[in-house]
Amino acid sequence: MAKIAVIVGSVREGRVTEKLATWVAKEVANQADVETLDLRDYPLPFFDETIPPRYNPSRTLAPEVKKWLDKIAEFDGYVIVTPEYNRSVSGVLKNALDNLGNEIADKPVALVAHGSTGGAQAVASLRITLPGNGAVTLPNALFFTDQVGEAIDDAGILKAELQEGPYSAQASLVGLVGALTAYSDALATVRT
């Protein structure tokens, strides 16, 4: 069974992203082993290296960076749940990704975003960034306006009306996670 990380891409107090990530993790748990990685638990120094980490395997790592890299390398695939800040992702998420070397190379990443425009620009930004880390982004993503905070309770339960029907948010998530696990299985042959 695939081991999937759900990454909470915001550290703000009262963040909607955490609720969304809880909902996502519940569905991932139905199809794979799951662990939620909260960037609050991985405070990283600001990335300022001259050589990109993918091309500098002998770089000296700060202990916080080593902890992050060791953890992220454990997984077969990822779901990044991100808010949209200023038409992109949060600075803390971008910094966490910039610190990666080959830990996510040849591994799939599903994207779930929220924001005033549904998080579309955050997803577009990640589709540019992640291939630089060697990751494979899934062609589909989930987009939510900021009202998603009212649609999901603190326990990660989606309102009933959003769970019903073939085009519901719940059905879309089930499909996205199914695709993620299929990509994970397929890409495992590339990584061996």
Where are these regions (language model features)?
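Residues at the starts of beta-strands that form the adenosine-phosphate
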Residues: 3, 33-35, 108
